């Protein structure tokens, strides 16, 4: 796996702009992923392989900010499975699960060069508010669009 803060459809919570390969994860870090408080965070995975021999090839998660009721997104997809729509599918699942749990939307930080991750969000058909600074796009993705008043300009 390649891990980097929201790089090509990936990211656990590691320092921004850090890219590295890993074959295993320390036990204490793994505990954050296997002991999930589903009231605050949600994690979904994609598997491949035969029953009882499945391998995790992708993970997507959000962690809820209690003050804003928005969830911060993170994705990890094994390099061999990039470009197959897995992150898009997991993103759609997280949208549904977050709405069911009363979240108002998502936030994410994506490097501008990470066009693959931006395509995932664009396919989600939700409005995306982006603020770009120093090559980093800070995204806010509300679940409900604000109503637009009919004016001569938008009719």
Regions found by a protein language model. Name each.
Residues 1-155:
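Long, contiguous binding/interaction regions
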